[in-house]
Curated annotation (Swiss-Prot):
The lineage of its organism: Bacteria, Bacillati, Actinomycetota, Actinomycetes, Bifidobacteriales. It catalyses: tRNA(Thr) + L-threonine + ATP = L-threonyl-tRNA(Thr) + AMP + diphosphate + H(+). The keyword RNA-binding applies. Homodimer. Its cofactor is Zn(2+). PROSITE patterns: AA_TRNA_LIGASE_II (PS50862), TGS (PS51880). It is an enzyme of class 6 (ligase). Its EC number is 6.1.1.3. It comes from Bifidobacterium longum (strain DJO10A). It is found in: Cytoplasm. This is Threonine--tRNA ligase. GO terms for cellular component: cytoplasm. The gene is thrS. One of its GO terms (molecular function) is threonine-tRNA ligase activity. Binds 1 zinc ion per subunit.
Amino acid sequence: MAQATISITVNGEAKEVEATTTGVELFAEDKNIIAVKINGENRDLYTPLNDGDTVDPIALDSEDGLAIMRHSATHVMAQAVQEVYPNAKLGVGPVIKDGFYYDFQVDQPFTPDDLKDIEKRMQRIIKSSQSFRRRSVTEEEALKEEADQPFKIELIEDKEAHLDPAAATEISEKELSFYDNVDRDGNVVWKDLCRGPHLPNTRYIKAFKIERSAAAYWRGSEKNPTMQRIYGTAWATKEDLKAYQTRLEEAAKRDHRKLGAEMDLFSFPDEIGPGLAVFHPKGAAVINAMEDYSREMHRKHHYSFVQTPHITKGGLYETSGHLHWYKDGMYPPMHLDEEKDADGNITKPGADYYLKPMNCPMHNLIFKSRQRSYRELPLRLFEFGTVYRYEKSGEVHGLTRVRGLTQDDSHIYCTREQMKDELTSLLTFVLNLLKDFGLTDFYLELSTKDPNKYVGSDEIWEEATNTLAEVAKESNLELVDDPCGAAFYGPKISVQARDAIGRTWQVSTIQLDFNLPERFQLEYIAKDGTHQRPVMIHRALFGSIERFFAVLLEHYAGAFPAWLAPVQVLGVPVADEFAPHLAGFVKSLEDEMVRCEIDYSDDRFGKKIRNASKSKVPFILIVGEEDMNNNAVSFRFRDGSQLNGVPVDTAREQILTVIKKRVQVNSADDFNAAVAE
């Protein structure tokens, strides 16, 4: 006899319900509930419940709810595409940050008109209130149903497809399933291979937008066919969608590529190649300010500065493991040093040299260059080391993803006993330095072992991961898990910073490594005279100079604080006869290493002021007749406010004070507050 009731826990409360109960009945009164979490796993609202289950609701406007809704939107989009292109071959349709995409193989790239048509068809599908219905299938059944879909067949036959983040939306490790789109008459009008979960029906998709299309390689490999990828976004309400679009508009204004060109900071000449930035004088001035302050702070924290070459023999990366685990991200080798006699016979074999993708192996050689004592530990090695990563041309993006990058790279060697204290002080150092650059809103991400890509024992990984987690939790910052996100040699903490418009950027990384010291046979003499392995900590505060430059440029929308600004003072004489007085004052600032310019152009004074305002210079200094007669200058700030007739000695001291304090000044009020403190 079937069990009449079952005992479950709902929202932490024990309940006795009918055995046929699902989430549909449990949460019937709350129309914002679109799915359930059963024993910690996201499931469809109509999933049968079992005795002893723990059930929690998933609201549409929650993080999980938005992800489910966006994934349902990918199905609606794919259905709409196949209405227009019945022969379109389907790839994958995962959820991404703030949106989703689906990959298609079609004869021609999608046009803007195609995207408009697809969006209209999606609206019709949504209004038709189609239900999403899951059904489990065998592999044989799945292959039969997807006989005309080669990319789906590949996923079905790939027993490790569930490990691919994009393919994991389609394939579960446990079982295969399809989702049918069922109309009001009960007819299946479309279907897709998918693990789910999904919305109860399409009408829960209340606010969406098709954004753009682009070419993409199937499963991210340039060896695979090219697909056409359509991106979209979906939100719980139309107000949320509008707010997102407003954020995009603001982000577009702050795009570092746009600002970099407008402010003459950097460029990417075709003659050099994609992903290889050239910094112009003004951009280099910002880089120098960043590096100079970083050097100052590293000296105060007892780091030893080193410098290493840009290329090395491949054997070094054989030892480190990079050639095994990271070769696809490295540039091809250069075969050098081979010698031949007159007959072409090799008399001295050559060696493969590589552009370095990482600095850590070279720092290990510095540690290993002589015998080390416990008295030297912790040993903190630091360099601004330029490394090279082979990024695909379609994946490079401004300064945030480049092929040549300079890391503020440090490797710290310490004892196991010193490890936790070193990590704690290091995290404090990182956060304080980022705050000095104007970033103040952080959370931490803990990246753990990828079971298919790691070196060393499970025990070592567990100890390293637990230590990092303990240090992260003691910081009192939010800690988010990043499963399988670690590099092959150790777990890491990433500092995620939110910028002025709420976007999240990964900046600093702190990685704990027991494995490379083992691979390089690093040792120190302990207090008892025994030879011991040091613990190694990899650390980059900026991540890379280029990426951090881009983050700051967008965070400040080009209006850097005075200490970072490419031009700190711009002089504008009211007329030519006042230029000598202004030049004399500017010279006194330049003697104090202030970055200054004077507008000697033939433009009218009003145009000079407009041009100066567009340049986002923190201090515009104006000199007219009254200023000259009183040995004074007048300030104009970014918001248009002014301070007139400031004596030159006072003005010079105040400018130097604001620069030294590293505070942001956009107005006369900001300026007065900064110099008064």
